[in-house]
């Protein structure tokens, strides 16, 4: 058997810091189970001897107590330890995500990350107690086989042959089932991706019956494939269990009917050997029945290990965070900057650049251009969220690289097109509630929400109101460079005018640099410069 097939699960469980007591307790539990068999057989031999029978009864009671105590310790301790390991995995994935490069994280995908954080960890958690029972059953089989060999070497030989044949048959079934589980896992991720479209685009789905039917049909097709794969996987495990049961019954038949014909001396121990084999059947059946859980847990562990490897590859190199951020906005320089999106084969599908641009301190710069022209990608390059494929970006003469990335980004506050609004002011130190209330009043949403116990009372607001809160949070960060992507698009005409004619001049007067993507040509006068982007390049300059 190729042990490497089980390495993902073992790799995860190897992080356990359990002391050796659980191993000894596991062995003692299995040994006590085998001792019960020997005690029962010995008591049966001495049934006519009252004194010996009483001693056997006391010994039997002691062994039962030992078995129960050790079994309880092993089960409770192992379950607690597995949950500790899974907790460490969740925290490790969270930290890896937080340190990941944005573009590489986008390529990994939400469904993959959510699947590992929830589905895969739940699978391993549910299998934990079952796998502990399997380990114990394996030890019980070993100790019981030793006792069986002491009774009859012929019976032991037949038992070993049956076990080897059964394991080989089961191994092939497990490999087949594992492939089906992998297929089911990928299909399930595909279903979650499609269902995300249903949830996030629910308004559009409700407005278009044809779209709803088409998307529902797509979900139904994926769900049908998922059902078929899981049925085949479950059927494979069911047949595996059936073959295991069959092999046990054939073995019993061989020992009871065949072995006495081949070895006359066996007839004296046939009853004890048969009882021993029947005693082994339980643990052996447990082993066979836990293989589906073992296989599922291994596939889940493999998915987690692969995700962690992908996230580690996507992790940004260590950055020097000790350098303090500049209090005034330094000049931004971009020289020969280029960034490309690529397809699965690595061929560029869209390129932004080359860009040569200088943004002086406290400048108000508007970026205009059609949809898909590259404005949002440019802003992610500008803020250091996307590393350039070519060229150099510098801030105050300090080049953006792996060592300076955190320092560079610490100068930017942003409300991008795909912004996320948090319910708390994460990362904003020493929150001044009065300042928060002043900003909410300035943005005319003080009657809609507020800050209580460090969190907003509600975020169930219109798109424009949510953007106002997002901008208020960006201002609370008090960073020298403010980047906005179509911020005014969801604002009413009156507040849009306030934004361009009052707020932007006020922020500029405070010494902030403002870079904003916009389509509002009637307010271009609020900018010091207006650059036009087309097909990823700045093709026109308006002043």
Segments the model singles out, each with a brief description of its role:
Residues 207, 273, 280-312, 316-317:
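Cytosolic ends of transmembrane helices, especially the final helix of ABC transmembrane type-1 domains
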Residues 14-70, 149-157, 267:
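Transmembrane helix-loop-helix hairpins at lipid-water interfaces of multipass membrane proteins
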Residues 10-17, 102, 119-127, 179-180, ...:
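An intracellular "coupling" helix at the cytosolic face of ABC transporter transmembrane type-1 domains
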Residues 98-143:
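Juxtamembrane loop-to-helix connectors within ABC transporter transmembrane domains
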Residues 31-42, 133-174, 231-277:
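A hydrophobic transmembrane-helix motif
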Residues 36-40, 63-106, 110, 129, ...:
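Juxtamembrane helix-loop junctions of ABC transporter transmembrane domains
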